[in-house]
Amino acid sequence: MYKRQIIDDTLSLRDAHCPGAKVSVLSNATQLHRDGVRRALRSVDNNILKLDSAFDATARLINNPQSPVYSVRRVVDQMKGFDGHLTVQTMFLRGEFDRQRVDNTTEEEVAAWLRLIGEIRPRQVMVYSLDRDTPCRTLEKVPREELQAIATRVEALGIPCSVA
């Protein structure tokens, strides 16, 4: 089914049965280059888009995007087109995956990610870490204190940030 139709049907059901309810959509943001996807996401109350790293190599390790032309820059440029009407959600983690070190909590990673958050200017940021078992036992949950320190840096940009 066409994604826009799913969103339209959801909004119609909400309007008919629970008009006060908010509709939220969490997207991995890899299809933001598609006009229909952007239009559909603009129509919901809470458009939550993933951005787990400022670097293509790290994003590929964490998210395994299937498109060979995937780039963080392309995703960020599309996010900027929402003019702040979005929430950015980021999962912080570290460990080893597929014999490669992955860690989006280093100063280099966090500083670059913060620069992108400053460019995007979302209405809110959500940061979290692993909360359940993963298929890869070598990945580690980031302590809440570290997540809170990252959130404080986001808030210094004038953007509200929640820690889960």
Residue ranges with predicted function:
Residues 3-128, 133-140:
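Conserved AdoMet/S-adenosylmethionine-binding subsite of the radical SAM
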Residues 1-2, 161:
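Generic detector of short, aliphatic-rich beta-strand segments that form the cores of beta-sheets
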Residues 143-164:
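Binuclear metal-ion centers of metallo-dependent hydrolases, dominated by the metallo-beta-lactamase
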